Each structure stands twice: as structure tokens, then as C-alpha cells.
Amino acid sequence: MVDLNDKVIRGYLLSLVGEDGLQMIEKMPEGEVTDEEIAAKTEVLLNTVRRTLFILNENKFAICRRERDSNSGWLTYLWRLDFSDIEHQLMKEKKKLLRNLKTRLEFEENNVFYMCPQGCVRLLFDEATETEFLCPMCGEDLVFYDNSHFIDVLRKRVDALSSA
């Protein structure tokens, strides 16, 4: 089983399946079990269990096996969790986050912004000229927005992720 006390793993799973899904993962019985058994043992609603299992399955953290009842012909779905690939998934997420942060950093560095003093909007220079430097929401005069602090924060975040 995966270490759910690890902040990174816990945060990643929480972002995937939410609090109820995380509760289900924590209390999930070992081996192959049906979704009804999971709901009964984890005290999580059946809809939530199914939603969580589908999300985990899409991310390759849950494995499903179908079994046909020889008498009734009904299918039974047996589920088990498999977090053996979580490190690889976390690396993919890290690369995606790093790529997005670099894109945002480049955008912030290469553009000039104007902002409404009331906080209504933040516009690019071209957009501000189109509105004649007036806020399209409230009509206030737009003021130059110095985003250097935001750029510094983004740069530190990119550096931290790159070195980790």
C-alpha cells in the first residue's frame, strides 16, 4: 500500500478524488472486493465509491476484473488498488506543472499590464489601449501594474521544482 502520510502523495490523491475518495482509499480492504463491499467497509456512499474507483482506474491506480455468475449470468466487478506506478505519475504531474509555470513566467515577463485600482480587471497593454485605459467594468482609470514581485515568485517556484 502507498504511504498516505506522505504530504505529496496525499495531496495528489486528494486533488484526484477529494476527501471522501481519500477516506475510501485509507479504509479500503485488501484484495479484490466489490464496490458494495467497499462502501460497506469504508462507510463512504456507493456513488462516491464508484466515482472514486473510476477516477483511480483512469489514472491506473485501480484494477478492475469482471466475473460472470454462472447461475444468474450477472457480472460482478472486483476492484483492487495498485499504487505501484504512483512515483511515475507524480513525475508526470511535476513536469506538467513545471511546463505550465514556465509558460506563465514567460507570459508575465514578456507583457505589460494595466489594472483597475478597484481590482476589477488586469489587462494587457494592447487591451488597455483598446479601452482607452478605462476599466471596462467600472470606468476607473487603469494604472500600470508592476508584476515584478509575481515574476520573482514564479521564478523561485520554477527553480525549486527544477532542482527537486
From Swiss-Prot:
Biological process terms in GO annotation: regulation of DNA-templated transcription; transcription initiation at RNA polymerase II promoter
Molecular function GO terms recorded: DNA binding
Domain called HTH TFE/IIEalpha-type: residue spans: 5-87
Keywords for this protein: DNA-binding, Transcription, Transcription regulation
PANTHER family cross-referenced by the UniProt entry: GENERAL TRANSCRIPTION FACTOR IIE SUBUNIT 1, TRANSCRIPTION INITIATION FACTOR IIE, ALPHA SUBUNIT
Domain description: The winged helix domain is involved in binding to DNA in the preinitiation complex.
Assigned protein family: Belongs to the TFE family.
Subunit structure, as described in the record: Monomer. Interaction with RNA polymerase subunits RpoF and RpoE is necessary for Tfe stimulatory transcription activity. Able to interact with Tbp and RNA polymerase in the absence of DNA promoter. Interacts both with the preinitiation and elongation complexes.
Name of the protein in its database record: Transcription factor E
Organism: Methanosarcina barkeri (strain Fusaro / DSM 804)
